[in-house]
Amino acid sequence: MASVGIEPSAAVRESTGNVTDADRLPEEMKDMKIQDDKEMEATIVNGNVTETGHIIVTTIGGRNGQPKQTISYMAERVVGHGSFGVVFQAKCLETGETVAIKKVLQDRRYKNRELQTMRLLDHPNVVSLKHCFFSTTEKDELYLNLVLEYVPETVHRVIKHYNKLNQRMPLVYVKLYTYQIFRSLSYIHRCIGVCHRDIKPQNLLVNPHTHQVKLCDFGSAKVLVKGEPNISYICSRYYRAPELIFGATEYTTAIDVWSAGCVLAELLLGQPLFPGESGVDQLVEIIKVLGTPTREEIKCMNPNYTEFKFPQIKAHPWHKIFHKRMPPEAVDLVSRLLQYSPNLRCAALDSLVHPFFDELRDPNARLPNGRFLPPLFNFKPHELKGVPVEMVAKLVPEHARKQCPWLSL
């Protein structure tokens, strides 16, 4: 395929409508040599069917002296769909492995930004890209197929499960899920320089046996370049940061932190904290809890709104939003994440060392069924690059340091 630019896909097409400097990779990422001819060369296959039983045959390898290898996938069932396309579960006939295949319509003029991002990612809390291929239809439409690891559940469905039982989610699961969300965000924000822009329970996959969480759906993800505009109509409504509602175009990765704060609150409450019925109503829901933003806070979100007159509403105390038995550490963390001023929100890495997660650092911590927790402290050197020694010592408890043999504490 012609490498003309990175595709501004449907959810990500920026306000200019054209490929701008904001669509180019920042200088420091050029060293990573993102090329189409990586190990996962994208071959083109005919057909665009996702019905149960349909078999897709593609090839991988064949570059840099590697032998070509044929892989066949049998479509099993559709597991998700939206404006982007469709996600279906499939089985690799050669290995028996179950995978998820995300199929999106591809504009031939551009590289696909989601594919470019996925090729950079390698983290235990981020869904991994196995390989990719293109498929064509009779109408000569081109589809990109991302072959991803399959994770059976989502945080959204886990929340619904506990609601049906009329139970609160065990606090250890709330801690586990939220910790892993922040670890994935710290990685994509600090190591890759990418903002996800659609953090929500539906985009957080969970293995129901190990309770390992993986962030998925990078269809809206983007490298945010300081001084360059981005669209503000991004992120699902209940999880949308206030600066986006205010129409800010020069936002930061702090929008993901706000969304993660909303997810944490939802795990604790069993329902969304800010269930707005429209964009404006979303702001009303936020104001009902946080109170009217000050002039200074509005300036931090979008300087163009400072003269706008808002109804003066007092903040609702956090301890009245959560039930009396809620641990104060949980309430404290929510309050540090859901700040109007983006620069005052607790960054993802800082959130990991918050006392709310201390239970997970206990060497005797176990799942409610007595099993071990999923790996939480297996940090790679680049994850902790530039982090002060005292903070590293807190992030990697003594009993877990064998998971990081490169550490010299």
Swiss-Prot record:
Autophosphorylated mainly on threonine and serine residues. One of its GO terms (cellular component) is cytoplasm. Keywords: Acetylation, ATP-binding, Cytoplasm, Kinase, Nucleotide-binding, Phosphoprotein, Serine/threonine-protein kinase, Transferase. Its EC number is 2.7.11.1. GO terms for biological process: meristem structural organization; protein autophosphorylation. Residues 73-357 form the Protein kinase domain. InterPro entries: GSK-3, Kinase-like_dom_sf, Prot_kinase_dom, Protein_kinase_ATP_BS, Ser/Thr_kinase_AS, STKc_GSK3. ATP binds at residues 79-87, 102. Binds to KIB1. Component of a complex made of POLAR, BASL, ASK7/BIN2 and ASK3/SK12. Binds to POLAR and BASL. Belongs to the protein kinase superfamily. CMGC Ser/Thr protein kinase family. GSK-3 subfamily. May mediate extracellular signals to regulate transcription in differentiating cells. Probably involved first at the cortical polarity site, to restrict MAPK signaling and promote asymmetric cell division (ACD), and second in the nucleus of stomatal lineage ground cells (SLGCs) or meristemoids, to limit cell division and to promote differentiation into pavement or stomatal guard cells, respectively. Phosphorylate YDA and SPCH in vitro. This is Shaggy-related protein kinase gamma. It comes from Arabidopsis thaliana (Mouse-ear cress).
